[in-house]
Amino acid sequence: MAPPSRHCLLLISTLGVFALNCFTKGQKNSTLIFTRENTIRNCSCSADIRDCDYSLANLMCNCKTVLPLAVERTSYNGHLTIWFTDTSALGHLLNFTLVQDLKLSLCSTNTLPTEYLAICGLKRLRINMEAKHPFPEQSLLIHSGGDSDSREKPMWLHKGWQPCMYISFLDMALFNRDSALKSYSIENVTSIANNFPDFSYFRTFPMPSNKSYVVTFIY
């Protein structure tokens, strides 16, 4: 059999590059954020990265360093993974931020305080605490409402703030326990600041009292 001509090889090579580009464009990148030494690394990853493997993340993902005070409140419609060693930056990253699919991975053996995060629109939560407990990754479905659900329609709290009709309160002390992830929800909650006076961040993020909320506690 005669070897393929140079023209055929060039055509095959071109088709291969085209197919690779189409495959890459078809992939949806996920966001990975990790905190180290008072800095935050915000990464866009085309593939899953092994939890807490900082070197691999820097190698395989497109990452940039962000100073904590420069972090802007945003929303995440896709997958968001956060690696953390303590809770110092989590409130700034997550409180009243719209996150639909969240994974939190503890990358240290630190004992975490009883501190609540308030997350908007959370549909699925995954947690990994293997650095502290030999416990498999856990997953919890919060709610599965679609865009057609009237409660999902955006309600803007303030310029630059995120729509927040579903609110999940996440107790960070759950990472200290080797027990199953649990939650319960309360529907049709009005005057949310009055019903939960111990949550001081409602003074920073005032919630309209004429709206109805679905509140979920995760512990």
UniProtKB/Swiss-Prot annotation:
<comment type="similarity">
    <text>Belongs to the EPCIP family.</text>
</comment>
<dbReference type="GO" id="GO:0042802">
    <property type="term" value="F:identical protein binding"/>
</dbReference>
<feature type="glycosylation site" description="N-linked (GlcNAc...) asparagine">
    <location>
        <position position="188"/>
    </location>
</feature>
<keyword id="KW-0732">Signal</keyword>
<dbReference type="InterPro" id="IPR029250">
    <property type="entry name" value="ECPIP"/>
</dbReference>
<comment type="function">
    <text>Likely to be involved with PKD1 in the detection, sequestration and exocytosis of senescent mitochondria.</text>
</comment>
<feature type="glycosylation site" description="N-linked (GlcNAc...) asparagine">
    <location>
        <position position="95"/>
    </location>
</feature>
<keyword id="KW-0325">Glycoprotein</keyword>
<dbReference type="GO" id="GO:0140494">
    <property type="term" value="C:migrasome"/>
</dbReference>
<comment type="subunit">
    <text>Homooligomer. Interacts with PKD1 (via the PKD repeats in the N-terminal extracellular region); the interaction is not dependent on N-glycosylation of either protein.</text>
</comment>
<feature type="glycosylation site" description="N-linked (GlcNAc...) asparagine">
    <location>
        <position position="29"/>
    </location>
</feature>
<feature type="glycosylation site" description="N-linked (GlcNAc...) asparagine">
    <location>
        <position position="210"/>
    </location>
</feature>
<dbReference type="GO" id="GO:0070062">
    <property type="term" value="C:extracellular exosome"/>
</dbReference>
<feature type="glycosylation site" description="N-linked (GlcNAc...) asparagine">
    <location>
        <position position="42"/>
    </location>
</feature>
<dbReference type="Pfam" id="PF15137">
    <property type="entry name" value="ECPIP"/>
</dbReference>
<protein>
    <recommendedName>
        <fullName>Exosomal polycystin-1-interacting protein</fullName>
    </recommendedName>
</protein>
<dbReference type="GO" id="GO:0160040">
    <property type="term" value="P:mitocytosis"/>
</dbReference>
<keyword id="KW-0964">Secreted</keyword>
<feature type="signal peptide">
    <location>
        <begin position="1"/>
        <end position="19"/>
    </location>
</feature>
